Every structure is written in C-alpha cells, then in structure tokens.
Amino acid sequence: MSKRTYQPNKRKRLKTHGFRSRMSTASGRRIISCRRRKNRETLTA
C-alpha cells in the first residue's frame, strides 16, 4: 500500500508557495496580481 501524498512540512510549503518564491518569477507575480484583483484574503501560503 502506498503512503499518503501530503506530508506536511512548513518549510517546504513556504519555499514552494510562499510570497518570496512567488515574487521571484514572472508567473508567480501574475498569480499574486490575479489574487489581489479577486480581493483574496490570503495571497500566498
């Protein structure tokens, strides 16, 4: 039997989906601007 795919890890979560990592790429900045446009409560993880 295979293990569950979600193995929570705070550091990995932020490194992958955090604000700094989003801002470091053009597509990430696009994600943030789209979420700002939608008035999302949380922009990033």
Swiss-Prot record:
Residue spans of biased composition, Basic residues class: 1-20
Q: Which residues, by range, are in coiled-coil regions?
A: none
Q: Which GO terms describe its biological process?
A: translation
**Alphabetized UniProt keyword annotations:** Ribonucleoprotein, Ribosomal protein
Q: Quick check: keyword Ribosomal protein in the entry?
A: yes
Region of interest (Disordered), residue spans: 1-45
- Keyword Nucleus assigned: no
> Which regions span the lipid bilayer?
none
A single Gene Ontology MF term assigned here is: structural constituent of ribosome
Would you tell me the Gene Ontology cellular component terms?
A: ribonucleoprotein complex; ribosome
Q: Which family does the record assign?
A: Belongs to the bacterial ribosomal protein bL34 family.
What is this protein called in UniProt? Answer: Large ribosomal subunit protein bL34
Q: What is the lineage of its organism?
A: Bacteria, Bacillati, Actinomycetota, Actinomycetes, Micrococcales
Gene encoding this chain?
Answer: rpmH
